[in-house]
């Protein structure tokens, strides 16, 4: 696999970018997760960042990437509406894994947003998308810019939802390389990694949550529900960070 030119790839239409990365992705599919991270650090430009929502399985990618590239900036976009358990989980993992945590928030506080727009998450798909743009997308774009990121690691997995089922290991999003080291892991592999390294699921896992985001758009799993239906009232799966 040869070195990739980010600037040249960004000038291509999206379809052509996908085709240009196809050969590299075919090779990356043959590597294990650690190998993919090592390859990215050797062949893709810095600065490097890792994003995390500190959700159910967050400890896996946080541990895996940070072990190979210690002190990598870890981007959290904090909406102000996370579960108390999530905030405590963030503190616990930051201390345990010695994370270089970088927290980004919307330029408007949660209270100010409610005063201006009402409860956007109760206003259908359009309201949810506006909420996500304000609280997730803009802060992430700002983080990537301020941290001079050119390569972005994330912990998405194909098994999590239909919208992620065909994602490649390597893509370009928001103008930077995006690497998904554990994209092909299943739930058993996640469990085995956590057990091997003495790591925990998010505390709400034991209470029946399969996915955890904001308090007002996360539901506990019930029989017959898919994981996708536990977020955003089943209207959306993605919060906007991993779209586009």
UniProtKB/Swiss-Prot annotation:
<dbReference type="GO" id="GO:0019379">
    <property type="term" value="P:sulfate assimilation, phosphoadenylyl sulfate reduction by phosphoadenylyl-sulfate reductase (thioredoxin)"/>
</dbReference>
<comment type="similarity">
    <text>Belongs to the PAPS reductase family. CysH subfamily.</text>
</comment>
<dbReference type="GO" id="GO:0004604">
    <property type="term" value="F:phosphoadenylyl-sulfate reductase (thioredoxin) activity"/>
</dbReference>
<dbReference type="Pfam" id="PF01507">
    <property type="entry name" value="PAPS_reduct"/>
</dbReference>
<dbReference type="InterPro" id="IPR002500">
    <property type="entry name" value="PAPS_reduct_dom"/>
</dbReference>
<comment type="pathway">
    <text>Sulfur metabolism; hydrogen sulfide biosynthesis; sulfite from sulfate: step 3/3.</text>
</comment>
<dbReference type="GO" id="GO:0005737">
    <property type="term" value="C:cytoplasm"/>
</dbReference>
<protein>
    <recommendedName>
        <fullName>Phosphoadenosine 5'-phosphosulfate reductase</fullName>
        <ecNumber>1.8.4.8</ecNumber>
    </recommendedName>
</protein>
<keyword id="KW-0963">Cytoplasm</keyword>
<dbReference type="InterPro" id="IPR004511">
    <property type="entry name" value="PAPS/APS_Rdtase"/>
</dbReference>
<dbReference type="GO" id="GO:0070814">
    <property type="term" value="P:hydrogen sulfide biosynthetic process"/>
</dbReference>
<dbReference type="InterPro" id="IPR011800">
    <property type="entry name" value="PAPS_reductase_CysH"/>
</dbReference>
<dbReference type="InterPro" id="IPR014729">
    <property type="entry name" value="Rossmann-like_a/b/a_fold"/>
</dbReference>
<comment type="function">
    <text>Catalyzes the formation of sulfite from phosphoadenosine 5'-phosphosulfate (PAPS) using thioredoxin as an electron donor.</text>
</comment>
<keyword id="KW-0560">Oxidoreductase</keyword>
<feature type="active site" description="Nucleophile; cysteine thiosulfonate intermediate">
    <location>
        <position position="239"/>
    </location>
</feature>
